[in-house]
A protein has these predicted regions:
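A charged, well-structured terminal subsegment
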Residues: 148-183
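Short Gly/Thr/Asp-enriched flexible loops that form oxyanion-binding sites at enzyme active sites
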Residues: 105-115
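Structural motif
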Residues: 72-84, 162
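Glycine-rich phosphate/diphosphate-binding loop of Rossmann-like nucleotide-binding domains
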Residues: 33-54
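Short beta-strand elements in bilobed, periplasmic/extracellular small-molecule ligand-binding domains
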Residues: 58-73, 144-151
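Short, well-structured alpha-helical segments in soluble
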Residues: 79-91, 110
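N-terminal amphipathic/basic leader segments beginning at the initiator methionine
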Residues: 1-24
Length: 183
């Protein structure tokens, strides 16, 4: 007896090819880069991303944050239309914060979608949802896809704590977005 397993992303199955095709070329540094931020609607995500964007500009010479969008639903991966907007507006993307099961899975799928479109992406998940993220990476055909992990939870942090977390994760975010800039 066989059972049909449905892909929760609503997309056709992708062959398990590792990270090939899911890893965009990295710039050597962020000087002059246009930064895109994708807010998944979770509490504190936009504050965190905005702080990261500001730090990328002030400390790594990024040209600025050129696009910020908020997803309509944290649990649904972005579509090709959103990816195309980012392709035209930025050079690198930071997205998150995955701090629940469905939003973590969608954040990983979003990062993979950006990468496949040629945009280096730094995805931030909390440590409580690593299995969910890894499962989605496998479903998307990129089982070795990497993201930045932070302590759970994010939603209950004060604004100052969120900013502190952004500063703490900044070196990992820079490393995820670049091929060689020391963090």
């Amino acid at each position: 007896m066989s059972h049909t397993i449905l892909d929760p992303t609503g997309r056709a199955a992708v062959a398990d090819t590792g990270v090939q095709g899911a890893h965009a070329p990295r710039p050597s540094g962020l000087t002059g880069a246009r930064v895109g931020l994708l807010d998944n609607t979770k509490h504190n995500a936009l504050l965190f991303l905005t702080e990261v964007g500001d730090l990328l500009v002030s400390e790594y010479g990024a040209a600025g944050v050129s696009i910020i969008e908020t997803k309509k639903s944290f649990s649904v991966p972005i579509d090709d239309e959103i990816v195309a907007r980012y392709q035209g507006a930025c050079d690198v993307v930071v997205t998150g914060v995955g701090d629940c099961g469905s939003c973590s899975a969608a954040a990983v799928a979003d990062g993979i979608n950006f990468e496949r479109a040629g945009l280096p992406a730094a995805v931030v998940l909390t440590d409580a949802f690593l299995t969910t993220g890894r499962t989605m990476a496998k479903v998307q055909g990129a089982p070795d896809y990497e993201w930045i992990t932070t302590q759970h939870p994010m939603a209950v942090l004060t604004p100052d704590q969120v900013k502190e977390r952004a500063r703490l994760l900044l070196p990992e975010i820079v490393q995820a977005l670049t091929a060689g800039e020391a963090a």
